[in-house]
Amino acid sequence: TKRIYLEHFGVDEHGLVPIWFAKDRGITYEEANQKYNDGITWKKAAHEKFSTKLLTTSSADFHYSDIREKLKTLLEKADVSIQEKTDAELYDMVLPPNSKHEKAFIRLVVTFVTLIKSSCKSVDEVLRQTKNAGDERSTFIIKNIFQPVYKRYIEELANINQIDFTDAILQATDICRSSHPVKYDYIIVDEFQDISVDRYNFLKVLREGNPPPKLYCVGDDWQSIYRFSGSDMALFNQFSDYFGQTEINKIETTYRFGEPLVSLSSQFIQRNEAQIKKNIHPFNPQVKTELQFCDYERRDYCNVIGQLVASIPLDKSVFLLGRYSFDDYYLSFMYKSVKEGNRFFYIIGDRKIEFLTVHKSKGLEADYVIILQCNKDTYGFPSLVSDDPVLNYVLTKSDQYPYGEERRLFYVAITRAKVKTYILYDRRFPSVFVDEFLHPEKITEESYAKHPNANKKWTRSADNFLLTLYHEGKSIKYIAEKMGRSQTSIVMRLGKLEGKRQ
């Protein structure tokens, strides 16, 4: 039997690993890069020492060659018979059915389809933007994944003679434009913080007339959590720019919760200066609502939740809240679950506790709230998935504050409780939001920094510009801001370029 080893190395054409290699492991980029490349060197040396056959591919092959053909050629030269898997088999391998990775991927695709329709853009228009920006990653994803799905979705709606909610808004707008709409004296809009471009266009058509009907809108920009469904916070925060002379009445009394949660939550949400400033105070100053952070070790996670639930009086209501619908995954191994219609419960001790996503909990309340998995992770809180750079081309640009949407969502989560909110986090990987409350001294600009050019390929002109700034004596921080990349990326690239010149 002939034994052959096939290794895929996750490095680009310059031998550099992706930035998330460091983020997911809680180490610096330099450490992640060095550690991974040391592993590559060791593996190659080991195969050479023991005269074993090693075939290799790298991430660079996906960009500069046909990885499938390269792999096929390598295997054929090594006299390996090839039995290719079907597309369905490959999909199940990459995204196992019902796994959190498959759910996150589906959510990303659905989000793009929703946004492309609500923003009134075409896929071709978005592709032109990605190509003009030199964003190869986003161009590839949109062209090869999102566009075919979007096309098939539109075809399926036509085949079954149905429309979705966005279609209903768009068609209603067209009907109003082409006919003589009813004249209104007043138009009242609730949850106005969630208004999107398509709904704004519909509202604008409804108000056509001389004089236009009076518009009365109610909303809370602190709870604007549907940006990924197309909502545009600028339509709320800059209301008068879109609708003319405006009178603003602030509702600054909360009837649900008291101090210290009122002050803590207000300070947290208003760190983002794009949010409207408000001075929230409780209706009853005697009401107290606590905010408590609870760390855990992974092996004790379910027990910690059980202990918290057991400590809550039996006559008090309790919510379990997750950033994702799969945040209750580990609970399912220890506690019995019960589904009642669209509601989901866990039997913990002698109690039936409802589990909800934070989005579903908006507008609801309980005496006690336990927020799960507030960890520094791709699927943590704040979520890193929802901010995938590919969505920047269809998202509104009204709020550029780092994790602005996630911050509002976290605010919604912690303010569902009337008595106490518990925030659970892995003691090894507390999220940046947890650190902001417990260890504000650890928070720096880099903690929240986003880098618009992080996914762009380094070009010769970019390299020359980098070297020019560096030799002019500019600081690494200045260069990083100027080039839209992280300071770590700049340091690594300089090391690569300076090494070539020696």
Please provide the spans of the model-predicted regions.
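Active-site beta-strand-loop-beta-strand hairpin of nuclease catalytic cores
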Residues: 1-15
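Conserved helicase NTPase motor core
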Residues: 135-235, 253, 363
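Short alpha-helical "recognition helix" segments of helix-turn-helix
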Residues: 479-481
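A basic/glycine-biased coupling hinge at the interface between accessory DNA-binding modules
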Residues: 12, 16-39, 44-51, 57-162
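Helicase P-loop NTPase motor core
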Residues: 245-247, 253-348, 361, 402
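Short, amphipathic alpha-helical "recognition" segments used to contact nucleic acids or chromatin
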Residues: 458-474
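Conserved helicase C-terminal RecA-like lobe
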Residues: 313-317, 352, 360-427, 431-436
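Conserved RecA-like helicase ATPase core segment
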Residues: 39-40, 44, 197-291
